[in-house]
């Protein structure tokens, strides 16, 4: 990817220290701009820190380590535990918003129960689960969360609306996941739509049949929605990168591409 020469001396503020924001900072710095990254959490990486928790995934943290090494060398100022105020943004010549996304919960009866948690909270250590867990959503996050739960000693069922579990998973990893599921007797419900959550079970429809799936806990892994940042009153050009841009960034490569693109437009 070609990094264009900068358009004069500019100060760029990056809001968000996930992979997209960090790549945007790298590219902006290489273009000769003064760059400040503001991350409200105490660590860089954003959702990578959650994605690295399931089995075999910790290697992806090397992407964060790379940016932690290269950005200071490029003169990028990193502000952890700090939110970018509108005053900070207006003091820059351009702002790149890279504030990520948040996980979704199904709007069905029982979804607000004490026995229901999100996969992101489970992986982040914010929610404790035990016993028989029903994971709603058999995509990448759902299957990886299921493996994590197996590692923690839980019994797991995976419920997926489509006709295949782990659709889109790497062909090198999928056989390992399926073997793990088989070894732990993971019940897989495909073509199954959840209609309600009750104490001790999930109600669902599989084809024309109404079924009941027993469980102690329900873990939601049904996708994400972009975060919004209030930029009303920000009077400098604002660009977007990563999940919050509305573009799907389901991989590190896509997040990097989004960060590069945003920084190259300034």
Task: Go through each PLM region and give its residues.
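Rossmann-like dinucleotide-binding cores of NAD(P)H-dependent redox enzymes
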Residues: 37-74, 146-192, 246-248
């Amino acid at each position: 990817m070609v990094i264009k020469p900068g358009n004069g001396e500019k100060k760029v503020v990056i809001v968000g220290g996930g992979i997209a924001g960090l790549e945007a900072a790298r590219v902006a710095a290489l273009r000769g701009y003064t760059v400040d990254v503001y991350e409200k959490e105490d660590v860089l990486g954003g959702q990578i820190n959650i994605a690295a928790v399931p089995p075999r995934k910790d290697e992806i943290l090397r992407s964060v380590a790379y940016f932690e090494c290269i950005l200071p060398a490029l003169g990028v100022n990193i502000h952890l535990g700090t939110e970018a105020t509108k005053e900070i943004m207006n003091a820059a010549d351009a702002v790149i918003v890279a504030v990520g996304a948040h996980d979704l919960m199904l709007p069905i009866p029982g979804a607000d129960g004490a026995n229901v948690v999100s996969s992101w909270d489970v992986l982040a250590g914010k929610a404790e689960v035990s016993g028989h867990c029903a994971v709603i959503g058999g995509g990448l996050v759902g299957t990886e969360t299921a493996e994590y739960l197996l590692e923690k000693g839980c019994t797991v069922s995976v419920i997926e609306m489509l006709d295949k579990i782990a659709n889109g998973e790497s062909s090198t990893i999928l056989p390992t996941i399926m073997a793990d599921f088989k070894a732990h007797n993971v019940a897989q419900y495909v073509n199954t739509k959840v209609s309600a959550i009750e104490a001790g079970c999930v109600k669902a429809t599989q084809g024309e049949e109404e079924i009941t799936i027993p469980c102690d806990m329900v873990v939601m892994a049904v996708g994400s929605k972009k975060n919004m940042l209030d930029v009303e009153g920000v009077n400098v050009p604002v660009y977007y990168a990563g999940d919050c841009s509305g573009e799907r960034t389901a991989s590190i490569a896509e997040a990097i591409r989004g960060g590069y693109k945003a920084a190259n437009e300034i």
